[in-house]
């Protein structure tokens, strides 16, 4: 938790992101911007960044019959690394969670969706939680996410509503996870039971306690977890 981001992501070396602490990123106090409107930056060049048909270059599916140039994913990461750091006070940041996905993938050696599927969802018997449900489920059983009138210009069903997550292939650390209430409930029950589900341990109790505890007196955040305000207010 006290390691620098550069320990895991070589691409940050030589930038001011190299020395960001993992703990500060998980508590949203690293100084990273709240978000960057990546999709808006592509709209002036829409014909060169998006295509209605998939090929080796345009293979990142952001919506039905809409594919993004694969190379644009690198542009997203570069924009994050080049963005100025701001105040280290608490402010939720999509960018922190986007980079945390890369950390998980570096450590595990597999993509975030594969890691979660193999480590939790499949062994727990959860069949209706995961990323990009349009790939694995009947679209008629998925509630539409939104009508996107600005970016993808269609009703989204089975595709993440967050534009940045869509541009990252529907799998991101900050958005993209779909679930039924039942499967989400089973996952939360595992956490409530100290990391055990149906007799099998998935997480250490001390890990859950550490990550779900307040970390600083000036922020309600745990490590990756949001928590009630110190005043007791929940909204």
Where do the model's predicted regions map?
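Short, glycine/proline-biased beta-turn/loop segments that scaffold the active-site neighborhood
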Residues: 2-15, 123-124
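Glycine-centered small-residue hotspots that permit tight backbone geometry or close packing
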Residues: 1-2, 158
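Short, surface-exposed loop or secondary-structure junction motifs
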Residues: 15-235
């Amino acid at each position: 938790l006290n390691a620098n981001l550069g320990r895991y992501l070589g691409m940050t070396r030589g930038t001011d992101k190299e020395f960001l602490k993992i703990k500060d990123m998980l508590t949203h106090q690293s100084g990273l911007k709240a978000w960057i409107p990546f999709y808006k930056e592509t709209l002036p060049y829409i014909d060169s960044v998006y295509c209605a048909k998939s090929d080796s270059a345009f293979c990142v599916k952001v919506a039905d019959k809409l594919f993004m140039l694969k190379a644009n994913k690198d542009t997203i990461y570069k924009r994050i690394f080049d963005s100025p750091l701001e105040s280290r006070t608490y402010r939720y940041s999509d960018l922190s969670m986007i980079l945390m996905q890369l950390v998980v993938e570096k450590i595990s050696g597999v993509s975030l969706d594969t890691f979660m599927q193999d480590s939790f969802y499949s062994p727990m018997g959860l069949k209706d939680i995961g990323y990009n449900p349009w790939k694995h489920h009947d679209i008629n059983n998925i509630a539409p996410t939104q009508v996107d009138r600005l970016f993808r210009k269609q009703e989204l069903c089975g595709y993440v509503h967050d534009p940045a997550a869509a541009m990252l292939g529907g799998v991101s650390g900050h958005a993209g996870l779909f679930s039924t209430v039942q499967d989400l409930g089973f996952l939360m029950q595992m956490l409530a039971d100290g990391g055990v589900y149906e007799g099998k341990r998935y997480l250490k109790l001390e890990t859950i306690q550490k990550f779900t505890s307040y970390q600083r007196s000036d922020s309600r955040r745990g490590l990756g977890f949001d928590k009630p305000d110190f005043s007791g207010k929940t909204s």
